[in-house]
């Protein structure tokens, strides 16, 4: 039985990973020890050393992250400690204990300015061999964390995710996420006091990731662990989309008309922080190496509301 040590256990992605690890088909293979940040602070090396010595894990899932883009510029020291210093500690400990480190990065390591493909055989979305070029501090810190793993960690999966949404919501956003926010704003816009449509950015191209779908893939990666499969992967629901398109899909699922969502440019919504325009990811590598099929984003939005919200 593989021992799995998890930090950031109350995060929306990690919550679903724990659920999948605990299903009857998986719990015979994994013994899970999960900690929220109050119980295990990954910025304290001594605390990590105690848990590694006590549990001798086969996997460490680094679910603790400082990822609210707007807040990072206000608290760069804390963001560096969580997103960079912790990975120095974890890499050292994982190497010492022959443990596989699972870390989560972001589509924001890219500038969003990838040139269009010259012919149909080339990949038009960002793939794992494209060079990162982050445009804000969040992307810079996450890319720095990636480099620690790629240069120093012996066994790791570094997984770039994008636009996460799940039942738990983001702890850093008080249990909210993009679909929840759109649902709330649609309800407000439908009230007598707020008849204006919901404004949503329409010129950023991304992927979104339903945490249930992503958790299923991550656990399959753990089940199929082999030396030649370690490395960097992109993981989100398939199909590029704009935030406006996601919001329109949420409105459709909830029974609202198209007129309830209004597209706006990024500059009208975000005035102080640069964001990349097109960070859509290619999932070919993870699908082919682990023989998985990732659902499309619009299907994921429908299932999210049907299974976990409505």
Residues covered by each model-derived region:
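Catalytic helix-loop patch of NAD(P)-dependent Rossmann-fold dehydrogenases
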Residues: 81, 85-89, 109-159, 163-166, ...
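NAD(P)H-binding glycine-rich loop region in Rossmannoid oxidoreductase-like domains
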Residues: 45-82, 93
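SDR active-site strand-loop-helix element
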Residues: 7, 35, 60-64, 101-107, ...
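NAD(P)-dependent short-chain dehydrogenase/reductase
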Residues: 147-206, 212-213, 219
